[in-house]
């Protein structure tokens, strides 16, 4: 029986290994992590991450050929294939701080693999890593190998949170990069045979190591670039009276462009886009390509501009002050169908409003009060480091309360900000909400989820990103 071990029980490792276990009943899969609470959650009915369909997959396999354990060394020692799915956060200090990936966790995982291994192994990069990481890992493994042979593969994930299980069941492609040697080709084939049990062969792509590593960074950069492109257009649409939804629909009808990732919003979030682009920028700078680095930096700059623009619009619309005004924030996760708040635009929007002394009442169906308070007291890149390294404010943010439903959050509010496109926000009784709000009542739709015309009929003043402005908003121009 082939034994697989995955180091890291997070958003990538957990779902990926669960699906491999489901699709390959003859393979034994162990997911290991040093976090006891996280492994306990994976072994309970309350999984540590929310992902549609994940519960069912885990329940079908757990205890049969899928195991979650804190005994990292035992499972690594026994495995034929070791996936490494640990965090590669942005460095917070030292060389490359604020841009370069921090490979501390990767290096310690590699040293541990070399230390405990008693048989040859295939080591698979699953985390997003800078180009040439495999080379560094290879050196660590080789210099500590005690005669054991390791083959390094790059197998980046292309999951989208919220549709991860669907993406794993029917991937656009599976990418496997390896060394162009006899041993390298054999290692690629071994991993390919696992995926081939449910993925059509034409969707399994094989490349050299460096192409696979760079492909992941490039894919995320291209996706983020599309979002920043349409968000840049949304600012122009507001200035000219065009409608960004109509513009993006027309543009997306061009078969060379396509309709995906053309929805304007308050900005992109999630654990990957900003981190990977900053990493790409750093790699370009290190390779003497400042013009290329500058090009990719603009994607982040537009994203930051969009969030700033949104906050400025809120403040200017509400008589240029939100001091001591209650603002309801609907949605805190970076997108719907996930509880993930990493790099969510909601953090910067909320901090911007708090900086203007607003009182916030936040509701998100999947994000806990503890998580919201932690996010709002954290420094820029600390979110991706272990909890014990994250600075905690001695007190919670006083001007922030967390509500259990949208109606409580919006009661007596002066304005509503919609920051996540949860389906339930489309079905709210806005007449009831309007009656319980201060007047004039504002809705700032950061995801273009509500029917602005219907809300205006009720009596709301509505701002939708990239849409023609209400007369009220035209009379109160926002600073860009």
From Swiss-Prot:
Binding site for substrate: 157-161, 216-223, 256-269, 334-335, 447
Reactions that this protein is recorded to catalyse: UDP-alpha-D-glucose + 2 NAD(+) + H2O = UDP-alpha-D-glucuronate + 2 NADH + 3 H(+)
SUPFAM superfamilies assigned: 6-phosphogluconate dehydrogenase C-terminal domain-like, NAD(P)-binding Rossmann-fold domains, UDP-glucose/GDP-mannose dehydrogenase C-terminal domain
Gene knockout outcome: No visible phenotype. Displays smaller nematode-induced syncytia. Ugd2 and ugd3 double mutant displays a strong dwarf phenotype and often develops seedlings with severe root defects; cell walls have an altered sugar composition. Ugd2 and ugd3 double mutant displays abnormal nematode-induced syncytia.
NAD keyword on record: yes
Active site annotation, chain numbering: 272
EC number of this enzyme: 1.1.1.22
GO molecular function: NAD binding; UDP-glucose 6-dehydrogenase activity
Record flagged with keyword Oxidoreductase: yes
UniProt keyword terms in alphabetical order: NAD, Oxidoreductase
GO biological processes: carbohydrate metabolic process; cell wall pectin metabolic process; UDP-glucuronate biosynthetic process
Pathway entry: Nucleotide-sugar biosynthesis; UDP-alpha-D-glucuronate biosynthesis; UDP-alpha-D-glucuronate from UDP-alpha-D-glucose: step 1/1
Gene3D superfamilies membership: Cytochrome c1, transmembrane anchor, C-terminal, NAD(P)-binding Rossmann-like Domain
Signal peptide residue numbers: none
Activity regulation summary: Inhibited by UDP-xylose.
Broad EC category: oxidoreductase
GO cellular component: plant-type cell wall
UniProt binding sites for NAD(+): 8-13, 33, 38, 86-90, 127-128, 161, 272-275, 342
Its job: Involved in the biosynthesis of UDP-glucuronic acid (UDP-GlcA), providing nucleotide sugars for cell-wall polymers. Required for the formation of cell wall ingrowths on the outer cell walls of nematode-induced syncytia.
The family this protein is said to belong to: Belongs to the UDP-glucose/GDP-mannose dehydrogenase family.
NCBIfam families, sorted: NDP-sugDHase
Descriptive protein name: UDP-glucose 6-dehydrogenase 3
Source organism of this protein record: Arabidopsis thaliana (Mouse-ear cress)
């Amino acid at each position: 029986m082939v034994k697989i071990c995955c180091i890291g029980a997070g958003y990538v490792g957990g779902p990926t290994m669960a699906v491999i276990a489901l699709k390959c009943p003859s393979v034994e899969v162990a997911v290991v992590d040093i976090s006891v609470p996280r492994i306990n959650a994976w072994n309970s009915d309350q999984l540590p991450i929310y992902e549609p369909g994940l519960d069912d997959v885990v329940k079908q396999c757990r205890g049969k050929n899928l195991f979650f354990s804190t005994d990292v060394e035992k499972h690594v020692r026994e495995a034929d294939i070791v996936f490494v799915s640990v965090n590669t956060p942005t460095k917070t200090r030292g060389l490359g701080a604020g841009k370069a990936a921090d490979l501390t966790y990767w290096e310690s995982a590699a040293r541990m693999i070399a230390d405990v291994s008693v048989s040859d192994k295939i080591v698979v990069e699953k985390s997003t890593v800078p180009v040439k990481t495999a080379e560094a890992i290879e050196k660590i493994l080789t210099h500590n190998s005690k005669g054991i042979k390791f083959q390094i593969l790059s197998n980046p994930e292309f999951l989208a949170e919220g549709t991860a299980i669907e993406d794993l069941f029917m991937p656009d492609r599976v990418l496997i990069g390896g060394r162009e040697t006899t041993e390298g080709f054999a290692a690629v084939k071994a991993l390919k045979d696992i995926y081939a049990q449910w993925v059509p062969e034409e969707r399994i792509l094989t490349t050299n190591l460096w192409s696979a590593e760079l492909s992941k960074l490039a894919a995320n950069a291209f996706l983020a670039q599309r979002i920043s492109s349409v968000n840049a257009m949304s600012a122009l649409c507001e200035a000219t009276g065009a409608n960004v939804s109509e513009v993006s629909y027309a543009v997306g009808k061009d078969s060379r462009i396509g309709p995906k990732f053309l929805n304007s919003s308050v900005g992109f979030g999630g654990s990957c886009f900003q981190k990977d682009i900053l990493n790409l920028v750093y790699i370009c700078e290190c390779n003497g390509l400042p013009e290329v680095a500058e090009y990719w930096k603009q994607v982040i700059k537009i994203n930051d501009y969009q969030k700033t623009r949104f906050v400025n619009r809120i403040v200017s619309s509400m008589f240029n002050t939100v001091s001591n005004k209650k603002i309801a924030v609907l949605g805190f996760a970076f997108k719907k169908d996930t509880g993930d708040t990493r790099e969510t635009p909601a953090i910067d929007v909320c901090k911007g409003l708090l900086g203007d002394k607003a009182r916030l009442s936040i509701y998100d169906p999947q994000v806990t009060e503890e998580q919201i308070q932690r996010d709002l007291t954290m420094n820029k890149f600390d979110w991706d480091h272990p909890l014990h390294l994250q600075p905690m404010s001695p007190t919670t943010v006083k001007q922030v309360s967390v509500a259990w439903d949208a109606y409580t959050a919006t009661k007596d509010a002066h304005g509503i900000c919609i920051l996540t496109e949860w389906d339930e926000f489309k079905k709210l009784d806005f007449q009831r909400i309007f009656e319980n709000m201060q007047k004039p009542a504002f809705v700032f739709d950061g995801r273009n989820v509500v029917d602005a015309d219907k809300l205006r009929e009720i009596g709301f003043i509505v701002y939708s990103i990239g849409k023609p402005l209400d007369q009220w908003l035209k009379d109160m121009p926002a600073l860009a």
